[in-house]
Amino acid sequence: MFSKSVTLAQYDPDLAAAIAQEDQRQQDHVELIASENYVSCAVMDAQGSQLTNKYAEGYPGKRYYGGCEYVDIVEQLAIDRVKELFGAAYANVQPHSGSQANQAVYASVLKPGDTILGMSLAHGGHLTHGASVNISGKLYNAVTYGLDENEVLDYAEVERLALEHKPKMIVAGASAYALQIDWAKFREIADKVGAYLFVDMAHYAGLVAGGEYPNPVPFCDFVTTTTHKTLRGPRGGVILCRDNTHEKALNSSIFPSLQGGPLMHVIAAKAVAFKEALQPEFKQYAKQVKINAAAMAEELVKRGLRIVSGRTESHVFLVDLQPMKITGKAAEAALGKAHITVNKNAIPNDPEKPFVTSGIRIGSAAMTTRGFNEADARVLANLVADVLSNPEDEANLAKVRKQVTALCNKYPVYGA
């Protein structure tokens, strides 16, 4: 029998210590990785619940195990809420990740060797959109589009490649593209060649939910998203559709094809996050995320840095470090010493290797969750520039770190 009186610290002090250290790191560092965010205590409560004990293969009302009457309620709440949030007719909340959601979409209507047209990883796309190192690039014949000479998504190239290669599916969405994507234009191109249109909105989903980024659902055959990032939920995935045409194929692609039992504790946490995103205050959050990102980009330009695509229209942007003569890898390390967390990221036509890069990616979602406003964002951008202008000066790093600490103390991750 387990006892509720035995704490993790008592039973496994080594693990408890590592968790405590990570808690402290999150408090003491400003998080600027675009794919990260903080979840609410309610989300964590749901994810840490006894639902983790329950196996529930199948779907609500059609399970392969007994005792699922209450987890059916949990999953249906998540389904209903995410459908309302994005105006979808169909939702599958069982994918363990965005990558698995994407795999399920491909498997539902494609056969190995079919052609897909997706955004190049080198220009801001995602591994799962046909990169050669990913299963999507191994199973399918992947053709890629990219950015034009102004570092704007090249819709003319998308259309030219679509007409040339006649893909069965066109994939839109990105992991490192700052501007708004024209879903209607993609729909127009897809219709010209009779292709399915699939949008991966993982990075933008929270902005879509908050009304600050165009909703792809009305234009697409398939939409996927992660539930973390700008959506502020647990780590996981979702599949959405504007109608129920592919319901049977998608459901069977997830279970039994790609996954077994769903993670009911994570689905419960998703349901909480969807409820939070349906509240009026989430719209203000999404608006502030964009304001903060734009403010940071503006300040960095003033300090002599170049922003890929020239600006941001979302939560994310890439910084070209070549004018500073520093690599992304070195910048990530220097900023980390100053308690500013970013990730190195390739820029379009990057001459450096992927593990080195010539850029960094900056996102405003997590800092905005903490409460950072536009003025704070501008201060933070200048602190980033201070580090990048003198990345090996320990005194400079210590000075910036002290100012970062003051900002972090002003905005604790979890208040009283």
Curated annotation (Swiss-Prot):
Q: Does the keyword Isomerase apply?
A: no
- SS bonds (residue pairs): none
Primary localization class, coarse: cytoplasm
**Which InterPro entries did the record assign?**
PyrdxlP-dep_Trfase, PyrdxlP-dep_Trfase_major, PyrdxlP-dep_Trfase_small, Ser_HO-MeTrfase, Ser_HO-MeTrfase-like, Ser_HO-MeTrfase_PLP_BS, SHMT-like_dom
Pathway, per Swiss-Prot/TrEMBL?
One-carbon metabolism; tetrahydrofolate interconversion; Amino-acid biosynthesis; glycine biosynthesis; glycine from L-serine: step 1/1
* Catalyzed reactions per annotation: (6R)-5,10-methylene-5,6,7,8-tetrahydrofolate + glycine + H2O = (6S)-5,6,7,8-tetrahydrofolate + L-serine
What subcellular locations does the record give?
A: Cytoplasm
Per the UniProt entry, the Enzyme Commission number(s) are 2.1.2.1
Q: Which UniProt keywords apply?
A: Amino-acid biosynthesis, Cytoplasm, One-carbon metabolism, Pyridoxal phosphate, Transferase
Requisite cofactors? pyridoxal 5'-phosphate
Listed name of the protein? Serine hydroxymethyltransferase
Q: Which species is this UniProt entry from? A: Neisseria meningitidis serogroup B (strain ATCC BAA-335 / MC58)
